[in-house]
A protein has these predicted regions:
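Hydrophobic transmembrane signal anchors and adjacent membrane-proximal interface regions, especially
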Residues: 7, 20-21, 44, 89, ...
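N-terminal leader/signal peptides at the extreme start of proteins
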Residues: 1-24
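Periplasmic/extracellular, small/polar-rich flexible segments of pilin-like filament-forming proteins
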Residues: 78-191
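A signal for specific C-terminal beta-sheet/loop modules enriched in small/flexible residues
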Residues: 1-7, 45, 58, 63, ...
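Intrinsic disorder/low-complexity segments
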Residues: 6-9, 41, 96, 155
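N-terminal single-pass transmembrane signal-anchor helix
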Residues: 18-54, 58
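Membrane-proximal N-terminal amphipathic helix
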Residues: 54-83
Length: 191
């Protein structure tokens, strides 16, 4: 009768059955270790890049939402007053916190009292106010680059421009030009 290769082998010493041998041979063990090592070398860089990919995706989502909100606010300004300067234009809802000042080009500039006939985006606080009004639930923002304080850092760039750096990975940013309404997303972590 033939025994299967998978069945237990029995050693005989001088005709006596002494022990049953089970397990891996040394060669099998070495092969498994080598295969696991190769998999680790190939897979490790991909798994390490997952965190960066998540940060890039977060900035892309925030940037796309911000860009859409700028476009909608501009459309509302065009419909309400022909796109010129407007003070306290109700963007959505009916609360004072949902109002924005629109500049002479018809784009969001700030949210500050008192009345201004020609509102301008001209400091980091204006950048923060535009950000906070345009998002219904905005990612946290401040003028600090401390990741424990806020997700984004607002930086004013003269004239009338903002750069929102992503604090967990500062190479990523969202750029807003209030004179043209352009929103640019820098989602290259190597830039």
């Amino acid at each position: 009768m033939l025994k299967s290769a998978r069945m237990e082998k029995q050693k005989t010493i001088m005709g006596k059955h002494t022990m049953k041998v089970k397990g891996f041979t040394l060669i099998e063990l070495v092969v498994v270790i080598v295969v696991l090592g190769i998999l680790a070398v190939v897979a490790a860089p991909r798994f390490l890049g997952v965190t960066t990919d998540a940060h890039v995706a977060s900035v892309q989502r925030s940037g796309a939402s911000f860009k859409t909100a700028i476009s909608l606010a501009h459309s509302k300004a065009m419909a309400m007053n022909g796109g010129g300067p407007a003070d306290n234009l109700q963007i959505y809802g009916d609360a004072p916190d949902d109002q924005l000042d629109i500049n002479r080009w018809g784009f969001p500039a700030q949210q500050w009292p008192p009345f201004e006939s020609d509102p301008r985006l001209d400091n980091s606080d204006d950048c923060i106010s535009v950000w906070n009004v345009l998002f219904v639930e905005p990612p946290s923002i401040s003028t600090s680059n401390d990741v424990n304080q806020s997700e984004y850092q607002a930086n004013y760039i003269n004239p009338g421009q903002c750069r929102y750096n992503y604090n967990p990975l500062p190479e990523l940013s969202i750029f807003y030009n209030s004179q043209t309404g352009d929103v640019t997303i820098d989602d290259d972590p190597d830039s």
